Regions:
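A conserved mid-protein helix/loop that constitutes part of the nucleotide-sugar donor-binding site
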Residues: 2-10, 166, 170-189, 199, ...
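A conserved nucleotide-sugar
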Residues: 16-18, 162-166, 180, 184-226
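A short helix/loop element that forms part of the nucleotide-sugar donor recognition site in Leloir-type
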Residues: 149-161, 214
Length: 349
């Protein structure tokens, strides 16, 4: 969420809008936004005492600033800031839903905000099913900031792999729902007859990281399945892959698929959440049912055994991300601006 908020604020400011933030005092965004030149108001929101103080503080900030729009991003800040905005008379209150998991109480979507934005159509459709009117919720995809092209990845040198080895890579935090074991189980049947095939995981997270290490050791495939842990040079590592695959079981959107396509990689993803919206099935990648090892194995085999298909899908994905700019910060700002103007006009009625 923090990355999305920072990119959105930066992109909206670039279009000439005045943007300020209200954060908890110890929030990670405080320093980052301040360093970027944004005004950041620090308001404590924990506990019942701070709830009342928070409503009063935010109301004062909104009245003094005469803001047109308040955008909230979690239940707590919606309950406090949206109520404050109602009291301050802020014209438009928008709640953003970042996650795909089930929502308990819908109060912070249907009562406090005037409108809702989501990170994928999948999440939008879920909220509509739960009672948010369709005309009051819009999808605004999360953007990625494209890194400079990588001339040569260090991945293969680090792992001792040859240029003609085939590397299937996955970048994801190590959680059970990310499907690391599913990906292992799908690729292992292909390894015996393909001695140059390797699987690389990038990402950390206990206890799944250690459990995955143990599972790989049990299979005796430590020289074919590589766990690199958390890395800060993901674009460098993506440039060393031949195929990107993530067998996630739950995902609101999945911008890592976009990052992989930006690197010119064909992608394999599971048909859950908003994943199908992140790439074009059959054109830039292959979509498979979740928890279906055979389908995942078949998709992997198609791309592993067909270099021409890899190149064709990789080129199409790179074009979609770089030339069409579907997931650029500028596109996010354009979409956000459009829905805000539309909703402000409706509210002014």
């Amino acid at each position: 969420q923090e990355g999305r908020i920072f990119k959105e604020m930066t992109a909206m400011r670039a279009r000439g809008h005045h943007i300020e933030a209200i954060c908890q005092p110890r929030a990670l965004l405080v320093e980052r936004l301040s360093d970027a030149g944004f005004t950041v108001h620090k308001v404590a929101m924990d506990g019942p005492v701070n709830y009342l103080k928070g409503v009063a503080a935010v109301r004062g900030i909104l009245k003094e600033g005469r803001f047109d729009v308040l955008n909230t991003h979690s239940r707590r800040d919606t309950v406090i800031a949206a109520l404050a905005a109602r009291l301050a008379g802020t014209p438009l209150i928008v709640r953003t839903r970042h996650l795909s998991n089930k929502v308990g109480s819908m109060w912070s979507y249907t009562c406090l905000p005037h409108r809702v934005t989501t990170v994928s159509d999948h999440v939008r459709e879920y909220l509509i099913e739960r009672g948010v009117p369709a005309n009051k919720v819009a999808t605004v995809y999360s953007p990625i900031v494209l890194p400079p092209p990588v001339e040569r990845s260090t991945l293969r040198d680090e792992l001792g792999l040859a240029d003609d080895d085939i590397v299937v890579g996955c970048v994801a935090v190590m959680r059970a729902t990310k499907g690391h074991k599913d990906l292992i189980d799908a690729i292992v049947p292909l390894m015996a007859s393909r001695p140059k095939l390797h699987l690389v995981f990038v990402g950390g997270g206990s206890p799944v990281f250690e459990q995955t290490q143990d599972y790989v050791a049990t299979l005796g495939l430590q020289d074919r399945i590589h766990l690199m842990g958390m890395r800060r040079d993901v674009p460098n590592l993506l440039a060393g892959f031949d195929v990107f695959a993530l067998a996630t079981q739950q995902e609101a959107s999945g911008t890592v698929y976009v990052e992989a396509q930006a690197s010119g990689l064909p992608v394999i993803g599971t048909d859950v959440g908003g994943v199908s919206e992140m790439f074009r099935n059959g054109e830039t990648g292959i979509l498979v049912p979740p928890k279906n090892p055979q389908a995942l194995t078949e998709a992997l085999q198609r791309l592993i055994d067909d270099p021409a298909l890899r190149r064709r899908m990789g080129d199409a994905g790179r074009k979609m991300v770089w030339e069409e700019a579907v997931f650029s910060p500028a596109r996010l700002a354009e979409t956000t601006e459009a829905v805000y103007w539309k909703w402000l006009a409706e509210r002014a009625g």
